[in-house]
Amino acid sequence: MSQFSFTKMHGLGNSYIYVNMFEEQIPEEDLALVAEKVSNINTGIGADGMILICPSDVAPVKMRMFNNDGSEGKSCGNGLRCVAKYAYEHKLVEETVFTIETLAGIVTAEVTVEDGVVTLAKIDMGAPRLTRAEIPMLGEGETPFIRENFLYNNHRYAFTAVSMGNPHAVIFVDDVEKAPLTTLGPVLETHEMFPERVNVEFIEILNDDEMNFRVWERGSGVTQACGTGACAAVVAAILNGKMERGKEITVHLAGGDLMIAWTEEGNVLMKGPAEVICRGVYEYKIEA
């Protein structure tokens, strides 16, 4: 029987099991199965996935994120805020501004601290990727993929594709509560046009600086929040002329609010909370 210490954290209800790989060891070949096991709500701890906080050669810490189906993702906005909180509070970093390595690249985190506790984290998510090759999508073309039609159940849905280090398909609707989240979501997620699958967001514009947001995440299904998805939604809204670049936009997710801005300089900034749920030791056995 193997075991490791963990911290379960969430960003707006998007929860992961966090493992400090500065102290713990999980064999590389076991990571996918361990992520699937520990995330199981019935036989594990229950979460949207597992995130490893690892040493890095190019930053103070590195984040590796696994979905609850065992697949590894390249980035996770809510996860990055929680990693930033963990790293500062566990003295893996000393400054309130520091970098985090991800499979999608290096991002900059800034934490707000009160009495030694991180109450808010802001992440510079970098510039959005908008070409088919960068998202990635099948086909050629260097222009952004904006409001392209997708036929489902005899209804045409127009979506805009954005990558924030992971791929997103953003669909604007009149009411997110009536959006086909659990039906169209998995169909679009696994469509052949997205070779790495895709996260699917449904967006309802409320006014010039507010939107409602619901998400079907690749590898996880419906979740309470998706930080990179909120960033992609704001970028898509601006590309479609629905919102103004440079303004801070409030994104109302099922789990709470994020503040997102696509700056004139090109990067996307995400600000929001990160909270600890519980800590403990997880025991597991890998069958031979």
UniProtKB/Swiss-Prot annotation:
This is Diaminopimelate epimerase. Homodimer. Signal peptide: none annotated. The keyword Membrane does not apply. It is an enzyme of class 5 (isomerase). The gene is dapF. Its main location: cytoplasm. GO terms for biological process: lysine biosynthetic process via diaminopimelate. The active site is at residues 76, 226. Pfam families: DAP_epimerase (PF01678). The lineage of its organism: Bacteria, Bacillati, Bacillota, Bacilli, Bacillales. The record marks 168, 217 as: Could be important to modulate the pK values of the two catalytic cysteine residues. It catalyses: (2S,6S)-2,6-diaminopimelate = meso-2,6-diaminopimelate. It is found in: Cytoplasm.
